[in-house]
């Protein structure tokens, strides 16, 4: 049932066509009439980055994806512009096209760029959090006084130095 490209009359000239046919058969087997049914079956209880990745993977399997990562990156840049506009407009976070919605769109597209490059967004964010923690610890250790007694300029200078030092160690 699941291998029509081998055992049945289904015609698939390319590997992409095989994958599309495969997804259609998997949906039929699960009683899902459409890709929308398939994506609605992705559990809401998953961490949001994993859920976004699953949604994007399912729709990509039927051809609903960017062909090139650079195109997805352009869309991410567009979403960042929309976020900037929402911030500058003073719209409340929960308003339509407000900051909350636009931040969500930025995260969703960043996840898409990661997926297209074979990077698990959840893992990438975990690593970024660890890197932030390391840098912040270095800032605190090098400050020589409580951080709440440092000016913004001092904190930024300490951050740049911590980033430079830690990045040099990881090379």
Regions from the language model: what does each represent?
Residues 1-103, 108-171:
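Flexible "arm" and connector segments at domain edges
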């Amino acid at each position: 049932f699941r291998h029509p490209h081998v055992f049945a009359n289904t015609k698939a000239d390319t590997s992409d066509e095989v994958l599309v046919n495969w997804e259609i058969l998997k949906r039929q087997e699960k009683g899902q009439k459409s890709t929308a049914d398939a994506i609605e079956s992705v559990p809401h209880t998953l961490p949001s980055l994993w859920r976004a990745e699953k949604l994007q993977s399912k729709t990509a399997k039927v051809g609903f994806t960017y062909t090139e990562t650079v195109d997805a990156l352009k869309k991410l840049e567009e979403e960042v512009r929309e976020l900037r506009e929402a911030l500058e407009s003073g719209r409340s976070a929960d308003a339509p096209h407000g900051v909350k919605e636009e931040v969500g769109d930025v995260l969703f597209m960043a996840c898409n760029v990661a997926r297209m490059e074979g990077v698990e967004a959840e893992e990438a964010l975990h690593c970024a959090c660890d890197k932030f923690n390391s840098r912040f610890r270095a800032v605190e250790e090098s400050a020589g006084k409580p951080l709440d007694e440092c000016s913004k300029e001092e904190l930024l200078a300490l951050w740049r130095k911590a980033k430079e030092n830690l990045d040099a160690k990881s090379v």
